[in-house]
Amino acid sequence: MKIVISGASGDLGRKITALLLQQVPASELILLTRHPAKLAAATALGAEVRKADFDDAPGLERALRGGDVMLLISTLSIGKRVQQHTTAIHAAKAAGIKHVVYTSSCGIQPQTPSISGKEHYATEHVLQKSGLHFTILRKSWYADVIPQLLMPAAIAMGTIGFSTGNGMVAPVAKADCARAAASVLANYRTHTNAIYEITGPQLFTLADMIAHCSTVSRKPIVYQNLSHADKQAIFDAMGISRDYQEGMMNDTTNAWASDEMITYEMAIKQGFFSICSRHIEMITGQPALSFAKVVQLHRASWDQQE
């Protein structure tokens, strides 16, 4: 069996690779990246690293040859990624891959206001019509975002705001997303044409999550229930581009295109993320981490920022 992982040098790709190396021989892994040098350690362990670019269809098909199942980690290129994902799916089929596992998003409905949600919806449609076997992992909002990326500034300023209203989300640990993906890949034949909701174990409003973090930090943090226009004005004042710019999103920042972030919050407010499942436990045999546990895991970094 040969498992292909796209975007293998990204944070999620690395986490999934590390877990797979505990389950299958390294020689069964084909890791795709635009920057092979970043995966030198995996090469040393015996994994095969291949250069691949979703904007280069012929090269991508060559890179996929010999694979049995591919993990298609959604790209960050808003506006381009439906075409990139379509290219990858067609290249996979041409290369002889039989099964594609795709990292999608919760709340995938044609009516979603979320820009990324619409792109995931379109990609899912292409994949389901491709003739390939598939597994779709619809990830909820990362539970790590607030405690890892937003809390240091919230503690310093004493306030934070979202335009999600009373909308609810079941935040999921990125580590759990990696666990679910690795388990599906290692046993992909048992997940044929399945769609899973990859969520945390409990629904919260954003205000609930901030209140919990405030209690844990022992710092007063005022939650602001903002309008979408107010939130857009904040992003504009921060100089965040409304449109996606290549390279603006990475593993240490949450500064994505503001139009995407605003429409994502709209989707939460309108109830598209009000989904809570036990699919992680069903897939992996272990329950998903609670939001409180994820906060605990990141708590020490707040002290370093104070």
PLM feature spans:
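Short loop/helix-cap segments at secondary-structure boundaries that form the rim of catalytic
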Residues: 38-45, 62
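Rossmann-fold cofactor-recognition segment
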Residues: 43-56
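Oxidoreductase cofactor-interface core, primarily capturing Rossmann-like NAD(P)-dependent enzymes
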Residues: 1-28, 33-37, 55-58, 65, ...
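A hydrophobic C-terminal alpha-helical subdomain
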Residues: 232-306
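Residues lining the SAM
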Residues: 6, 73, 103, 285
